Amino acid sequence: VPWLGKVILGTTDSPRQDVVREPLPFKEEVAFILNESARYLSRAPKQEDIRSIWVGLRPLVKPQDEDGGNTKSISREHTVLASRSGLVTVTGGKWTTYRAMAEDVLQKCFDTGVLPPKAAGITNQLPLVGSPVGAVQHSISDAPGIHLYGAEAAAVASLPGSAKELGGGLTEAMVRFAARFEYARTVEDVLARRSRLLFLDARKAIDMAPAVAGILQEELGIDPQLPAFLALAQQYLRPEM
């Protein structure tokens, strides 16, 4: 899948018994993905082509009439359940359908009386932050990556360091914007959540981390947790096979 100038290869379907915050990949999974990709790409990918590798655990809702042994047959759709106590639970699903999941949760709350019924929601017409209403043209310089901010581009360009590239598509101003307006508080917030550099190129994220930490320290005056990020990012480097 093409993504932000890179290519994501995956996925695997390996049941796991351990539940940890940052699961590590199985070497067999990495080998499987490389071997399968070689069947479809003009040049077979190799270990040294890997820039970052990560694992996520997907919650699947097991049907009551199945033993759950074959995870491939279990639906990837989300499920909303309401208990007798009034607890409403959403499980399964994926981040890309978060709005639909939220709507279904609220509808379940209305249907079960947990919340008083309200008129139809506005989610379908609600623009995301930064989405301009109509065409908007800003008199700003061609700062790197500034187009990604939509209607907030002018605000990013007005901050110190808008032309100072740190690498990985980030400028100093983007880090400042993340700290001031996007509630970024740590290096991980910036390099893994406000941007996706950790997932695109772990080594580059490691190299940039001290500069990002310095900007956050200047902006916020708090510990940006640089050592914690460096330890985390090491796990995203390709494993030795």
Task: Indicate residue ranges for each PLM-predicted region.
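C-terminal accessory subdomains/tails of enzymes that are appended
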Residues: 3-6, 12-241
